[in-house]
Amino acid sequence: MNAVRGRFAARTVRVKAPGKINVSLDVGPLREDGYHSVASVYLAVSLYEEVAATSTATEGITVSISPASTLDLSDVDIPLDERNLAYKAAAIMADVSEHSTGVHLEITKRVPVAGGMGGGSADAAATLLACDALWNSGLSRDELAHLAAELGADVPFALLGGTAVGLGVGDELSPALAKAQMDWVLVTADYGLSTPEVFRTLDRLRLAEGLTVDEPAAVDPKILQALRSGDADALSRVLVNDLQRASIELAPGLRDTLGLGESCGAIAGLVSGSGPTVALLTHSPEAAAGLAEDLGHHGLNALAVHGPVPGARIISDTLL
């Protein structure tokens, strides 16, 4: 958009926000409200969504997907209306800022859709920050985090980034002082898994086994110690994801991916969140790059990433 209509000049604020992996996920029993309490450790990784928010002279919110997106979205139905999480974030910001002009959101997708990495949540976090800047709302990070929590359990973490412990339904975040870089390979799938379906499958498996579990109260301190020290070997021994077996039940090929990753040199691996993305831990950037290349030769889509990385950040602010 390169127009000045009367006194209106378009402006674009571009923000990037990271995807995440769960290096630990303990899931409690099904609650009466239909949710599950969790105790999780989130790690923001160097795979980013970008949102370019451009002011428009007319009211309303529009959304498009950038052709620069690195994902094959030909078979993916991404809603571009009020069902889209970025759209919802812009609507909340419009209400809070009482802004009278509209906004167009162009989303560059890089985080796998329905891959258990919070791509949609990253879009929402990026949109909150972009619209806050675009409309000069002047909200603090704490105020933005409060709005983020209204949008979904993973949105506050995409705003925060780094490493954090998540309790409750995952939205009660406490930053963890773990800044040592860890190197991972992400193996993405050409299909998605429904998070609610994965949780329902876990409930079914537990019921069939007569297994009862307690409400998770805290994460294993050994995980935080390993992350603080940057000790990949120590971390490999305490990786856990209660949802993993449910994800494998729904997508048995994930077991093969995990096995292949470890046979090709990963220290350890796990399904990230509800899947189907698989996260494989390595010792170094060089090891991660080599593993990603090897898995690519086996026909898998593998990406070398590192974490932790910061949360949503403005990368450009341009008057058009």
UniProtKB/Swiss-Prot annotation:
Pathway: Isoprenoid biosynthesis; isopentenyl diphosphate biosynthesis via DXP pathway; isopentenyl diphosphate from 1-deoxy-D-xylulose 5-phosphate: step 3/6. Its EC number is 2.7.1.148. ATP binds at residues 112-122. The keyword Membrane does not apply. The active site is at 20, 154. It catalyses: 4-CDP-2-C-methyl-D-erythritol + ATP = 4-CDP-2-C-methyl-D-erythritol 2-phosphate + ADP + H(+). Belongs to the GHMP kinase family. IspE subfamily. Catalyzes the phosphorylation of the position 2 hydroxy group of 4-diphosphocytidyl-2C-methyl-D-erythritol. This is 4-diphosphocytidyl-2-C-methyl-D-erythritol kinase.
